[in-house]
Amino acid sequence: MTVVQVLKPGYTIEAGNGQIRADGTITLIRGTKNLIVDTGSPHDRGIILESLTREGLGVGDIDYVVCTHGHCDHIGNNNLFQGAVFIVCHDISRGDLYTLHDFSRKPYVVAEGISIIATPGHTS
């Protein structure tokens, strides 16, 4: 069974003077493979570590890190997951080994019931 948990909800709030306060959502997907979707900002490190510990997981238990795009509130703690496969935007890599995949043509299947699809958004 695949379970999706929001470890930290994201937000966008007008702050006045042409500024906003914003931070991305951090999501854990547990199944036959464990995924983190977006690793937040660097100041979210403690939230990630505490949340994983609470769930009985460590950083080494995460098989995939999926980052929806390269903004700092989505990739700020990627370095915690040294053993994971990274899917960042349209790149799939483990260390310096890249897997070629055309997301515009088909989903990337991580495990049964878990696929990654392209969803162009505010960075497209």
Segment roles from a protein language model:
Residues 8-10, 90, 120:
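Residues at the C-termini of beta-strands that transition into short coil/loop
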Residues 17, 23, 40-109:
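Active-site HxH/HxHxD metal-binding segment of metal-dependent hydrolases
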Residues 5-7, 66, 87, 117:
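Hydrophobic/aromatic beta-strand patches that form the interior of the parallel beta-sheet core
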Residues 101-123:
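A mid-sequence, solvent-exposed acidic-amphipathic segment
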Residues 35-38, 86-88, 114-116:
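Short hydrophobic-aromatic micro-motifs
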Residues 29, 38, 62, 69, ...:
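Divalent metal-coordination and catalytic microenvironments
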Residues 1-32, 107-108, 112:
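Zn-dependent metallo-beta-lactamase
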Residues 11, 41, 123:
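Short, glycine/serine-rich, charged loops/turns that create anion-binding
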